[in-house]
Amino acid sequence: MLVDEPASVLSIWRQALAIIRRYPLAALIPAVVLGSLGDAPYYFIKGEINLREEIVTSLTGAFAFYLYIIYVTYAEEVTDEAELGVERITLLGVLHELRQASPVVPTALVASVAAILIPRVAITLLLIPGLWLLTRWALFAPVISKEHLGPVAALKRSSELVRGHFELVFLTAALATVLEEAASHAGAVAGLVVTNSDTWGQWLGGSVVASLVMPLAAFATSVAYMHLRQSSQ
């Protein structure tokens, strides 16, 4: 069982990797779908971007963000399977877990506006307050998935869980959020350098890296929440 090991930064990352190794199909298939959809319209628009193309890009980006929230809540379901000792998750099992996660996605999406977008703006303006907010609210998605709270209550509950464990959450769940986005952009740059294509090359590089990093980020968040919830009971 995952809770047998005391919570620490290294143990959380190690357990997140263990879940991915145990369920590679369940971890990677949804991530590949999300990773490939991410910024595809942006990278494939050539020349000057007009208003219609900007709208399409914005809508697709919003849809990709919606899919990311699905993946984070889905990761919570898969973590539960690992906690129960399930040996493998089939393709049908993946679809089942996605269906299980989908009802809480709208609530999680609303909470994410505060939990992710506001800290990003704050980081742009002033680094420390943004990282502080990002860490305090980093556990909102698993809180909504498992405790069935509304957006505001989930943010408050996340802050309660983080209290006294700020460094642990900062170096796991908060770092995972930053790592996922930074790695995706780095992959796009690498794709451009390797292929010399600012369309399909950047898209391919970003998609591959996002597909690999996203599961680690999501499961690290889920495992961190699980440990802190157990310790608070």
Regions found by a protein language model. Give the residues of each.
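Hydrophobic alpha-helical membrane segments
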Residues: M1-Q233
